[in-house]
Regions:
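C-terminal nucleotide
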Residues: 2-122, 137-177
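Short beta-strand->loop micro-motif that forms the acidic, two-metal-ion catalytic signature
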Residues: 131-137
Length: 177
């Protein structure tokens, strides 16, 4: 669902997030030289430096480290056809992008909260945030009622309907052996 909020991706906003993550990584690497990138770190390592770095840097690093695990969880869940876990991790990603990495906006959070309230399996920010779209994992039986409700409630709150782009899971990209 497209909020129709234009991405105002101020490079300075992304630069601040990158700097936060680099700072957290540098503090972790000082104690764990094997850590070259934040993706090499664990939450245990991050917790070891929590008093050494600003709270904002901690939150942003927490999102990045958590997101790495969520991606791995989703890969495993997809191989097993476990869409409930996929959906749970999607909601976790949205929470992290909104509350920890701070790249969501009111409209995206509204659609995510509405999806959860409507029983949608999963929902998250799509792309870089600061506006744009959510992607939603919706069971076929809920699809029509969710779209109708989302359009009505979003319009009542923001004065316009979100755009809806239908996609269907397919055998698209896959591992070749």
């Amino acid at each position: 669902m497209d909020t129709v909020v234009k991405h105002e991706l101020a490079s300075s906003a992304y630069n601040r997030r990158r700097e936060s993550c680099e700072n957290a990584c540098a503090h972790i690497a000082a104690k764990h030289p094997e850590v070259k990138y934040l993706s090499d770190a664990t939450m245990t390592m991050l917790n070891e430096v929590d008093v050494e770095i600003p709270a904002e840097d901690y939150m942003r690093a927490e999102y990045v480290i958590g997101e790495k695990q969520r991606v791995l969880d989703v890969c495993d869940a997809l191989e097993k056809g476990d869409y409930e876990t996929v959906g749970d991790r999607m909601y976790g990603t949205h929470y992290g992008m909104s509350k920890l990495y701070e790249v969501s906006c009111e409209e995206l959070d509204f659609l995510n909260d509405l999806a959860k309230a409507c029983g949608v399996t999963g929902s998250r920010v799509m792309g870089g945030g600061f506006g744009g779209c959510t992607i939603n994992l919706v069971k076929e039986a809920l699809y029509d009622s969710f779209i109708k409700t989302a359009k009505e409630k979003f319009n009542a709150r923001f004065g316009h309907e979100p755009k809806v782009y239908d996609v269907v899971i397919s055998d698209g990209a896959r591992k070749i052996e």
